Amino acid sequence: MADTTGRIPLWIIGTVTGIPVIGLIGIFFYGSYSGLGSSL
């Protein structure tokens, strides 16, 4: 799958996959702190 691109820097993969994860975690904690997460 990654044969044409060669080596992909891990920091690029970490950034691309980390930003959405941090966003979802941030939304989750914001919802729990504001009281919205308690209804889940």
From Swiss-Prot:
One GO process term, biological-process aspect? photosynthesis
The record describes its membrane topology as: Single-pass membrane protein
Major subcellular location class? plastid
- Stored Gene3D superfamilies: 6.10.250.2070
Cellular component GO terms, alphabetically?
Answer: chloroplast thylakoid membrane; photosystem II; photosystem II reaction center
Localization, UniProt: Plastid, Chloroplast thylakoid membrane
Has the keyword Plastid been applied to this entry? yes
Q: Which residues cross the membrane?
A: 8-28
Q: Which UniProt keywords apply?
A: Chloroplast, Membrane, Photosynthesis, Photosystem II, Plastid, Reaction center, Thylakoid, Transmembrane, Transmembrane helix
**Key word Protein transport present:** no
Highest taxon, organism lineage: Eukaryota
Described purpose of this protein according to its UniProt entry: One of the components of the core complex of photosystem II (PSII). PSII is a light-driven water:plastoquinone oxidoreductase that uses light energy to abstract electrons from H(2)O, generating O(2) and a proton gradient subsequently used for ATP formation. It consists of a core antenna complex that captures photons, and an electron transfer chain that converts photonic excitation into a charge separation.
Q: How does it assemble?
A: PSII is composed of 1 copy each of membrane proteins PsbA, PsbB, PsbC, PsbD, PsbE, PsbF, PsbH, PsbI, PsbJ, PsbK, PsbL, PsbM, PsbT, PsbX, PsbY, PsbZ, Psb30/Ycf12, at least 3 peripheral proteins of the oxygen-evolving complex and a large number of cofactors. It forms dimeric complexes.
Question: Which PANTHER family does the entry link to?
Answer: PHOTOSYSTEM II REACTION CENTER PROTEIN J
The family note in this entry says:
Belongs to the PsbJ family.
Check the record and name the HAMAP family matching this protein. Answer: PSII_PsbJ
Q: What is this protein called?
A: Photosystem II reaction center protein J
Q: Which organism is it from?
A: Populus trichocarpa
Gene label: psbJ
